[in-house]
């Protein structure tokens, strides 16, 4: 049997390098946008909650 491992390596690499890279890039961008959107929402909610609590605290201190 005359098998040259170099040829099979080239075939395997050419098929599998393109397929996962394209799919992982698509998943990656979807994950990035999902993660960014959720982190932005958490940041806004956290910041707004903090400001609201701070305002309530300051108003309560002024009443005393």
Curated annotation (Swiss-Prot):
Residues 1-6, 23-24 form a propeptide. It comes from the Eukaryota. Its main location: secreted. One of its GO terms (biological process) is neuropeptide signaling pathway. Orcokinin-3 is expressed throughout the central nervous system (at protein level). It is found in: Secreted. GO terms for cellular component: extracellular region. Keywords: Cleavage on pair of basic residues, Neuropeptide, Secreted. Myotropic peptides. Belongs to the orcokinin family. This is Orcokinin peptides. It comes from Camponotus floridanus. The lineage of its organism: Eukaryota, Metazoa, Ecdysozoa, Arthropoda, Hexapoda.
């Amino acid at each position: 049997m005359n098998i040259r491992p170099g040829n099979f390596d080239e075939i395997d690499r050419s098929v599998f390098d393109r397929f996962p890279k394209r799919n992982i890039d698509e998943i990656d961008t979807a994950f990035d946008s999902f993660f960014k959107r959720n982190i932005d929402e958490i940041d806004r909610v956290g910041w707004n909650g903090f400001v609201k609590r701070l305002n309530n605290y300051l108003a309560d201190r002024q009443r005393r």
